[in-house]
């Protein structure tokens, strides 16, 4: 029973926040002292989670995520997702490119007392930057592009 409740909580959060931009869902699905584990250090609190969602939803106003797989075990829920959208706003210093992007990734959420207490996110950042035209792969030696 706990696995299905945890899965429902995570699905509610992901769909409302990421697909509809409704960050109010975070107040009921995420713990007050939520920890978002990021490559540059842990970020604490619901407000940071809201800011993250809003940053991506502002940069990609038509952002849509599809949830390909979801697996729950104990207090963890793992979700494999694909996101698509059009880059129409600034994101991390990258001005709007007007380009469409499609990336995949994985969220891991740990729940405690029915709320998301920790989150990890891994996604194809290199693929996103390539699709936005921010970076290019260099042509191998001897091959002209």
PLM region spans:
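C-terminal and inter-domain tail/linker signature
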Residues: 1-145
């Amino acid at each position: 029973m706990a696995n299905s409740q945890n899965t429902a909580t995570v699905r509610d959060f992901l769909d409302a926040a990421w697909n509809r931009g409704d960050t109010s869902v975070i107040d009921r699905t995420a713990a007050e002292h939520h920890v978002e584990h990021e490559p540059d250090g842990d970020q604490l609190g619901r407000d940071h989670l809201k800011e993250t969602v809003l940053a991506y939803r502002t940069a990609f106003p038509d952002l849509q995520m599809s949830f390909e797989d979801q697996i729950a075990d104990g207090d963890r829920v793992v979700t494999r997702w694909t996101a698509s959208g059009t880059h129409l706003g600034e994101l991390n210093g990258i001005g709007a490119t007007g380009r469409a992007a499609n990336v995949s990734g994985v969220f891991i959420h740990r729940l405690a007392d029915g709320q998301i207490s920790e989150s990890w996110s891994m996604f194809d950042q290199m693929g996103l930057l390539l699709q936005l035209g921010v970076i290019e792969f260099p042509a191998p030696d001897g091959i002209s592009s």
